Amino acid sequence: MKRPNNRPTNTMSLILCLTLSSLCVSSQSASVHGKNFATNRAVKSSSPFVVLSPDDNVVSMSGENGYRSALREAFDKSSRDYDDNGEDVFSNEKRRLRFHKRRLRFDRRDQDEGNFRRFPTNAVSMSADENSPFDLSNEDGAVYQRDLRAPRLRFYSLRKRAAGGMEQSEGQNPETESHSRRKRSVLTPSLSSLGESLESGISKRISINQDLKAITDMLLTEQIRERQRYLADLRQRLLEKGKRSSGVSLLTSNKDEEQRELLKAISNLLD
């Protein structure tokens, strides 16, 4: 029998050992970019304000001594901000990291070494538009931060309107003058104003009905009086005409019988 060939197995094991050794060597080494340093484990949790530049010098570390020297080199410029009191560098490592990140974020002095962009905290001077009729920072004297205030809209919210203080500024602007509180109350009245307007409308309607009834009664009374005067005048004329004709024609001729009967009927009707 032939002996089994173990060369492929030996080759695979050799490749695996070389790979593991290279991984171990790479995990023990790290790099420092300028004064902003981070290990492979701490890169994910680093602050977004720590910006690494490709122009920075890369310092390789080998062992504990290289790491200590990198730490001292990274914080030698900011050592004036603390008091070491002769202690070791690693005793205040976390505090130094926190202070370094805070200084990168909030320091307003000129940073010649860093390539990050500083965000101004007082954004009123940059965001306030003097020509904009909707910016109230200069008119009301209030200071608004860009990250804390609402976006600029044409109309303000009801909460700001109810708080007051914007009525005067709205009246000064020609574009928002038509939407002031005084004119808006006419377009959209409240419940109390609706009730008052309803009561006033009812009272006006009642007064108008009463006036119409009084006018109608007065006209009817005048018509009745005019009719009574007309009938009295007509009766008086008929009576006078009958008296004048009765003395001449009624006694001398029988032709006037019909007229006499007619006059009697008219006189009885008028009486």
Swiss-Prot record:
Positions of the UniProt region annotated as Disordered: 162-190
Tissues where this protein is expressed: Bag cell neurons.
Subcellular location: Secreted
Matching InterPro entries: ELH
GO biological process: neuropeptide signaling pathway
Secretion signal span: 1-28
Family of the protein in this entry: Belongs to the molluscan ELH family.
Function: ELH acts as a neurotransmitter locally, upon neurons of the abdominal ganglion and as a hormone by diffusing into the circulating hemolymph and modulating the activity of other organs. It specifically causes contraction of smooth muscle in the ovotestis and expulsion of the egg string.
Listed name of the protein: ELH
